[in-house]
């Protein structure tokens, strides 16, 4: 449930927060982390802009492998995770194990999930693509390498679709629109990642975005020449180039940035949109 603030100041006029999701992590499932997400490399040079600051965070250990096989677990809590835009669930398994997983859309407290090779095709269950999973099934948290854990479709609202099976491979349509092959032995979780409307929630003020570690975005044309190729000039000057560029001088707005001659090129049937 989205809770709108009572308007007492201009900054709370348009702000919204989820009133049903709290953050009360278990001590054995968290650990401290060095806050290195400031967009700098080892030399202190900015390599990714608009990052820095933010509130201190504790890292939640998420079970992306789902290797608690054939043991049913119950959803005990649905919690906020400051390290991702998706919610997480605390699972109590029948053998006493407690783990966090990504919250599947529609899952509520008290639901039961299980992972294995012979489990039902229902929301939140994790199973290999080689099972009787029908074509068109919505999945998330998909493995690329067997046993490494889910790496694809993990963001809030992300969902991929199983569109074909042939030989030792399965064909998936990923959230980006890319169509690629994955080994059928890799596992995936049935359903869509929760918190679908995260991109529609209004933060209400600039300070709320600063708490998330996101710095203001500034146009290059208003910078100095030392800071951006578009900078400099007298008054409102044009960028002085035929085409826009990045802060490092590379062509911007549509240039392909993927490295060439990667092994996975042979597995990609259609590039992302």
Curated annotation (Swiss-Prot):
GO cellular component: chloroplast; mitochondrial large ribosomal subunit
One GO BP annotation of this record: mitochondrial translation
PANTHER family assigned: LARGE RIBOSOMAL SUBUNIT PROTEIN UL2M, RIBOSOMAL PROTEIN L2
Keyword ATP-binding listed: no
Disordered as annotated region, ranges: 1-25, 224-273
Quaternary structure and interacting proteins, as annotated: Part of the 50S ribosomal subunit.
Compartments where found: Plastid, Chloroplast
Gene3D superfamilies: 2.30.30.30, Nucleic acid-binding proteins (2.40.50.140), Ribosomal protein L2, domain 3 (4.10.950.10)
Keywords: Chloroplast, Plastid, Ribonucleoprotein, Ribosomal protein
PROSITE patterns: RIBOSOMAL_L2
Origin species: Liriodendron tulipifera
GO molecular function (one): structural constituent of ribosome
Annotated InterPro entries: NA-bd_OB-fold (IPR012340), Rib_uL2_dom2 (IPR014722), Ribosomal_uL2 (IPR002171), Ribosomal_uL2_bac/org-type (IPR005880), Ribosomal_uL2_C (IPR022669), Ribosomal_uL2_CS (IPR022671), Ribosomal_uL2_dom3 (IPR014726), Ribosomal_uL2_RNA-bd_dom (IPR022666)
Ranges annotated as biased composition (Polar residues): 1-14
Main location group: plastid
Pfam families recorded: Ribosomal_L2, Ribosomal_L2_C
Protein name from the UniProt record: Large ribosomal subunit protein uL2cz
Protein family membership: Belongs to the universal ribosomal protein uL2 family.
């Amino acid at each position: 449930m989205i809770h709108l603030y009572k308007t007492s100041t201009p900054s709370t006029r348009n702000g919204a927060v989820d009133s049903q999701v709290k953050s009360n992590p278990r001590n054995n499932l968290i650990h401290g982390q060095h806050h290195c997400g400031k967009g700098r490399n080892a030399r202190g040079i900015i390599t990714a802009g608009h990052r820095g600051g933010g509130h201190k965070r504790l890292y939640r250990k998420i079970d992306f492998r789902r290797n608690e096989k054939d043991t049913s677990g119950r959803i005990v809590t649905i919690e906020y995770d400051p390290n991702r835009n998706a919610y997480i669930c605390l699972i109590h398994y029948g053998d006493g194990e407690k783990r966090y997983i990504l919250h599947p859309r529609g899952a509520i407290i008290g639901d039961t999930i299980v992972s294995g090779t012979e489990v039902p095709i229902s929301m939140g269950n994790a199973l290999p693509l080689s099972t009787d999973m029908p074509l068109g099934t919505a999945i998330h948290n998909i493995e690329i390498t067997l046993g490494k854990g889910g790496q694809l479709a993990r963001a809030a609202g992300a969902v991929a679709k199983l569109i074909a099976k042939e030989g030792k491979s399965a064909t998936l349509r990923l959230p980006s629109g890319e169509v690629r092959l994955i080994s059928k032995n890799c596992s995936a979780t049935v359903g869509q990642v929760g918190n679908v409307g995260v991109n529609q929630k209004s933060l209400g003020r600039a300070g709320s975005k600063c708490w998330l570690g996101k710095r203001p975005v500034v146009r290059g044309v208003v910078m100095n020449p030392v800071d951006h190729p578009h900078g400099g000039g007298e008054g409102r000057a044009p960028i002085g180039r035929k085409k826009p560029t990045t802060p490092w001088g590379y062509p911007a707005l549509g240039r392909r940035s993927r490295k060439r001659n990667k092994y996975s090129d042979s597995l990609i049937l259609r590039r992302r949109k």
